[in-house]
């Protein structure tokens, strides 16, 4: 699929992704398009693996300046989104790092924390198993 219109770049790409997910969830949109990056794609893969999103697709832009990624939110038969909330934790002005012993439980284990580690982006559960700490990017429930 080729896209003509490029979304605006944002200062904090991770914040932009979570804002788009939250807005799409509230507006009950099915698909969302944003500028692609390796970090965004890694986050989307985690959300798909955990069952929060249906799929994603990397799109080519006509001007070929920036790649785009389009992802599909997952809904139940009653049009209830599988994502109830997203909260960004680490921000450009205040990075939050934790060791694996101090990684938070989101809603007593019902949600996930997305962690950026030296081994890549992963959930808090995987980081605890690997005994790796890192930067807490966001909570998803």
Curated annotation (Swiss-Prot):
Name of the protein this chain belongs to: Small ribosomal subunit protein uS8
Gene from which this protein is expressed: rpsH
HAMAP family cross-referenced by the UniProt entry: Ribosomal_uS8_B
Oligomeric and partner information: Part of the 30S ribosomal subunit. Contacts proteins S5 and S12.
Protein family membership: Belongs to the universal ribosomal protein uS8 family.
The protein's role, per its UniProt record: One of the primary rRNA binding proteins, it binds directly to 16S rRNA central domain where it helps coordinate assembly of the platform of the 30S subunit.
Annotated GO biological process: translation
Cystine bridges: none
Matches recorded under NCBIfam families: PRK00136.1
GO cellular component: cytosolic small ribosomal subunit
InterPro entries the record matches: Ribosomal_uS8, Ribosomal_uS8_CS, Ribosomal_uS8_sf
Keywords for this protein: Ribonucleoprotein, Ribosomal protein, RNA-binding, rRNA-binding
MF term (GO), any: structural constituent of ribosome
